[in-house]
Amino acid sequence: MASEQAAESYTVEELVAVNPYNPDILNDLEGFVNDQVSNQTYNLDANLSLLRLYQFEPERLSVQIVSRILIKALMAMPGPDFSLCLFLIPEHVQMEEQFKTLIVLSHYLETARFRQFWDEASKNRNILDVVPGFEQAIQSYAIHVLSLTYQKVPRPVLAEAINIEGLALDKFLEHHIANSGWVIEKGARSQLIVLPRNEFNHPELKKNTAETVPFEHVTRIFPVLS
């Protein structure tokens, strides 16, 4: 009883930091996953801790909770979170249909096959809709990928990548013009969306490494070389 009262005085993050392998916190971690879903927050360390505990106590594994963890991990792309989580999930669990679907979706995102991703996602709304913000997170990831390649994105390419068309796309563009520095140009066949400059779509912005080393760091190297 005393230990339970002591545990209640700590946050889930603190419990994980103190002893991530404590099976007594498994229920707390499951509740924390549901909190992340409802509050649209995210804590990879806590979720990994829960998946490790499931390895030690497989009979307590909740398929619903694991599914939510993987969906939240997909939303964290381009981070490696999905792979980190999947590594801790037993193969026989991965063979369940909903997990095979999430693995396919992950592959489409990693290879920037956005049309295939949205087609597959539309067939599995029952899995994905339980996690608010999923669609918006993937749209942000798609824009990130486009910004690594394009200086100017044709409107149809953007529409396919984020799965938005028509008036909804017009409103989406208006928002990013006002808040993200996007600019619209007229192209020969369609609108072009000019994305903010970065070192990937404008390589000239990427400075030579030598140019970015402060002089005081260079002077510290000389005694070592001599």
Curated annotation (Swiss-Prot):
Entry-linked InterPro entries: ARM-type_fold (IPR016024), CSN8_PSD8_EIF3K (IPR033464), eIF3k (IPR009374), PCI_dom (IPR000717), Transl_init_fac_sub12_N_euk (IPR016020), WH-like_DNA-bd_sf (IPR036388), WH_DNA-bd_sf (IPR036390)
Keyword Cytoplasm: yes
Pfam families, A to Z: CSN8_PSD8_EIF3K (PF10075)
A single BP term in Gene Ontology: formation of cytoplasmic translation initiation complex
Organism domain of life: Eukaryota
GO cellular component: eukaryotic 43S preinitiation complex; eukaryotic 48S preinitiation complex; eukaryotic translation initiation factor 3 complex
Primary localization class, coarse: cytoplasm
Compartmental location: Cytoplasm
Keyword Protein biosynthesis listed: yes
GO molecular function: ribosome binding; RNA binding; translation initiation factor activity
Record-annotated PCI domain positions: 42-200
Subunit structure: Component of the eukaryotic translation initiation factor 3 (eIF-3) complex.
Similarity remark: Belongs to the eIF-3 subunit K family.
Task of the protein: Component of the eukaryotic translation initiation factor 3 (eIF-3) complex, which is involved in protein synthesis of a specialized repertoire of mRNAs and, together with other initiation factors, stimulates binding of mRNA and methionyl-tRNAi to the 40S ribosome. The eIF-3 complex specifically targets and initiates translation of a subset of mRNAs involved in cell proliferation.
Protein known as: Eukaryotic translation initiation factor 3 subunit K
Species: Oryza sativa subsp. japonica
Lineage: Eukaryota, Viridiplantae, Streptophyta, Embryophyta, Tracheophyta
Gene name per UniProt: TIF3K1
